Amino acid sequence: MGKTLFDKLWNRHVIYGKEGEPQLLYVDLHLIHEVTSPQAFEGLRMENRPLRRPDKTFATMDHNVPTEDIFNIQDLVAKKQIEALQTNCAEFGVTLADMGSDRQGIVHMVGPETGLTQPGKVIVCGDSHTATHGAFGAIGFGIGSSEVEHVFATQTIWQQKPKSMGIEIKGKLPKGVYAKDIILHLIATYGVAFGTGYAVEYYGETIQNMSMEERMTICNMAIEGGAKMGMMAPDETTFEYVRGREYAPTDMEKAISDWKTLQTDPDAEYDLHIEMDASTLEPYVTWGTNPEMGVPFSRAFPEIKDMNYERAYEYMGLKPGQKAEQIELGYVFIGSCTNARLSDLEEAARIVKGNKVKNNIRALVVPGSRQVRNAAESIGLDKIFIAAGFEWREPGCSMCLGMNPDQVPDGVHCASTSNRNFEGRQGKGARTHLVSPAMAAAAAINGHFIDIRKEAVISGGN
């Protein structure tokens, strides 16, 4: 019987262990940031251990970075974590994309941009959205601080092999519908736990026709569907993305020859298989307090079916039967490792251009990396957003999570391009609605959610 992409990747990296039991995997790339690494570095120091492979470790600042003024860190804990990463990287010989450097940004954007993220690798990071890197035909998953220390010391990690799931996505995306809507649809349809215990491969004509940036959006939120990791087979789109980047292979053609073997064999079988027709999708909006609580734009919010729904409606200040356009928005956030890439900002700017943010909205655009910010400014996107009334910020995780100054006030609804809408995720009492960058941009200039498939409803002015 043939092998799946996941099987091939996993088998390449097993050092020790029997099938059905935890196995020791070799780690090709360890990405770190300021929040989950301090304890791990301290563990090495206490045991007088070296960091085994500094050359396979790469650090950046993202979670705690103030995006209004990156060097003005008021929070003492955040400042201490950032200073600790600087000290630790210098002591242990780890390359650091430091504050203000041309490579600094959200860790899951910096990896691909620098060419560190490549097909065939096992990539780990002390962050749950490491699944993003699976878009390149890699294994990527998040680990805890104790596991970060284990990788520091050994360049390996113990893991139980997940089962395999194949999600075949067919059809052309309708106008106004994006990769973000695909993953929101899957989670709303099958739930936040449907991927538990699985490594998910997304494939099919819809995926093949996507850019790498779109593919990363889908893999980024595999974890929100419960999966251990998400991945896609590498192809010419992947190879061209990696080619010429700072850490791309020296012998690119040799690498591509190997990467082309990283495909699921025709006679391979997944443990679970799902099919999806993307041609019938609508823009999605979440109404509740987990990504499963989402609906197509045309559909009303569902009836209360259990205590979780009842609590979600109470927290969000919404009722069954309402529709997305009735939500009284106060904030719009375009950013995060899900949707802060150049193509995301270009699509948002296309909608924003020539319009103005409504008076009831505070709108932020936070590029996910310095590279994206520089590229956006080189084509004038910053001017479009600023002219419309958006705040144009420095790169960082920003309003995706309440760990830095960018937070949504208590009780305020926010249209957000991030990946999680949990209670308090964007700040105490914040009410988060997950959408695509286009939906968020249109909401900013209309003051509420609109059906972006109907261009006539995009209006300017206050």
From Swiss-Prot:
Pathway given in the UniProt record: Amino-acid biosynthesis; L-leucine biosynthesis; L-leucine from 3-methyl-2-oxobutanoate: step 2/4
UniProt EC number: 4.2.1.33
Keywords, ordered alphabetically: 4Fe-4S, Amino-acid biosynthesis, Branched-chain amino acid biosynthesis, Iron, Iron-sulfur, Leucine biosynthesis, Lyase, Metal-binding
Catalytic activity, reaction form: (2R,3S)-3-isopropylmalate = (2S)-2-isopropylmalate
UniProt record, GO biological process: L-leucine biosynthetic process
Cofactor notes: Binds 1 [4Fe-4S] cluster per subunit.
GO molecular function: 3-isopropylmalate dehydratase activity; 4 iron, 4 sulfur cluster binding; metal ion binding
Enzyme class (EC, first level): lyase
Database matches in SUPFAM superfamilies: Aconitase iron-sulfur domain (SSF53732)
UniProt keyword Amino-acid biosynthesis present: yes
A Pfam family reported for this protein in Swiss-Prot or TrEMBL: Aconitase
Source domain of life: Bacteria
UniProt entry tagged with the keyword 4Fe-4S: yes
Requisite cofactors: [4Fe-4S] cluster
Family: Belongs to the aconitase/IPM isomerase family. LeuC type 1 subfamily.
Primary role: Catalyzes the isomerization between 2-isopropylmalate and 3-isopropylmalate, via the formation of 2-isopropylmaleate.
Subunit structure: Heterodimer of LeuC and LeuD.
The protein's name: 3-isopropylmalate dehydratase large subunit
Protein's gene: leuC
